[in-house]
């Protein structure tokens, strides 16, 4: 039995009994005066968006220290603040997100998943969680036959428009809320978020990425990276930044103007045009060898390779449990913590096996 398989036995705590244990542990820490000591508490939720939102509210109410595990038939997610004081990540899990509002049956079902890694404050990531899927659905022409037959070039345009609208919304919101938000910086426009989103259809997976969160497809036991990290020292990104009049300064790694460690993001109005919200988009056909899709923030990818992440997911899959996606997500967060990741860690695992994912 591999280490990953052993971890699966203890990584995920599900049900009322686990929730009671988590509450008891939190109470003991409060009485001992060590609240916020950074231990990982997982609170399981029921499947669906309502469960996700309830668990997120509970995590935020506890000051961002508690972990979040979401269990559903087609996907699982885990999110933990880790060694950070605040939780600034957000995840979005929206099944059949493009269903027509009038109750008609959509031409083809598709699901939406996203990971948003905020910086400076959580409100941009939170806004992306609440709105990005709606904007993508609107730009798709929700449920129309044209959406089902969309070509790769059209998908690129769809995602670019969606990200541009999301960027404009959060910048306008930041200006309106400036001075009333608990941001790290003096100004609300110093806040932003990465965005890696996936639209999963019956025949393909569409990924749009802006920042250094990442999407990896596990296919036949091997990883296929579906997005490219936007780092300031990536040659093409460095050229783009300098052409716009900006600079990349190496201070604890490559940073735009010595500040931001990514070259694309939602928000960050004070760094435009050097930091752009234009996503890179990939359209990948699904195959019978596909196992799962992993979306995660750099809190995972900084310390766990694509290969290791797929190995963990496969180990959980081989156990044959219905909740294996949630197990894999939780094991990956625990692995990142064990390897001393210094950031928030959020992981979404989507079942892509034929007959299971859709």
From Swiss-Prot:
Keywords: Cytoplasm, Hydrolase, Magnesium, Manganese, Metal-binding, Nucleus, Protein phosphatase, Stress response. Mn(2+) 1 binds at residues 117-118. Its EC number is 3.1.3.16. Binds 2 magnesium or manganese ions per subunit. Plants overexpressing P2C68 exhibit insensitivity to abscisic acid (ABA), and tolerance to high salt and mannitol stresses during seed germination, root growth and overall seedling growth. At adult stage, P2C68 overexpression leads to high tolerance to salt, mannitol and drought stresses with far better physiological parameters such as water loss, fresh weight, chlorophyll content and photosynthetic potential. Coiled coil: none annotated. One of its GO terms (biological process) is regulation of intracellular signal transduction. PANTHER family: PROTEIN PHOSPHATASE. Residues 74-352 form the PPM-type phosphatase domain. Its main location: nucleus. Its cofactor is Mg(2+); Mn(2+). Pfam families: PP2C (PF00481). It is found in: Nucleus; Cytoplasm, Cytosol. Belongs to the PP2C family. Mn(2+) 2 binds at residues 117, 298, 343. This is Probable protein phosphatase 2C 68. GO terms for molecular function: metal ion binding; protein serine/threonine phosphatase activity. CDD domains: PP2Cc. It catalyses: O-phospho-L-seryl-[protein] + H2O = L-seryl-[protein] + phosphate; O-phospho-L-threonyl-[protein] + H2O = L-threonyl-[protein] + phosphate. Induction: Induced by salt, osmotic and cold stresses. Induced by abscisic acid (ABA).
């Amino acid at each position: 039995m591999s280490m990953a398989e052993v971890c699966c036995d203890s990584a995920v705590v599900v049900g009322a009994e686990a929730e009671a244990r988590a509450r008891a542990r939190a109470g003991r820490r409060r009485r001992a005066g060590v609240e916020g000591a950074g231990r990982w508490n997982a609170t399981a939720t029921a499947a669906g968006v309502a469960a996700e939102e309830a668990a997120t509210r509970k995590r935020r109410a506890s000051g961002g220290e508690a972990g979040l595990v979401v269990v559903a038939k087609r996907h699982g997610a885990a999110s933990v603040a880790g060694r950070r004081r605040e939780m600034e990540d957000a995840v979005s899990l929206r099944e059949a997100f493009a269903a027509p509002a009038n109750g008609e049956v959509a031409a083809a079902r598709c699901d939406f998943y996203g990971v948003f890694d905020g910086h400076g404050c959580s409100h941009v990531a939170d806004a992306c969680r609440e709105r990005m899927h709606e904007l993508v659905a609107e730009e798709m022409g929700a449920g129309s036959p044209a959406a089902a037959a969309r070509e790769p070039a059209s998908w690129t345009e769809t995602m670019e428009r969606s990200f541009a609208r999301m960027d404009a919304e959060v910048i306008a919101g930041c200006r309106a809320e400036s001075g009333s938000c608990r941001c790290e910086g003096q100004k609300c426009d110093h806040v932003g978020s990465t965005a890696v989103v996936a639209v999963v259809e019956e025949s393909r997976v569409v990924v749009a990425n802006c920042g250094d969160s990442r999407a990896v497809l596990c296919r036949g036991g091997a990883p296929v990276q579906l997005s490219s990290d936007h780092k300031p020292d990536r040659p093409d990104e460095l050229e783009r930044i300098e052409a716009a009049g900006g600079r990349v300064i190496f201070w604890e790694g490559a940073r735009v103007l010595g500040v931001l460690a990514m070259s694309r993001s939602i928000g960050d109005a004070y760094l435009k045009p050097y930091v752009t919200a234009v996503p890179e988009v990939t359209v990948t056909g699904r195959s019978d060898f596909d196992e799962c899709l992993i979306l995660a923030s750099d809190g995972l990818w900084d310390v766990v390779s694509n290969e290791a992440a797929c190995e963990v997911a496969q180990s959980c899959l081989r156990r044959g449990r219905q909740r294996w996606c949630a197990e894999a997500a939780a094991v990956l967060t625990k692995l990142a913590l064990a390897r001393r990741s210094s950031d928030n860690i959020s992981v979404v695992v989507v079942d892509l096996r034929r007959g299971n994912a859709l």
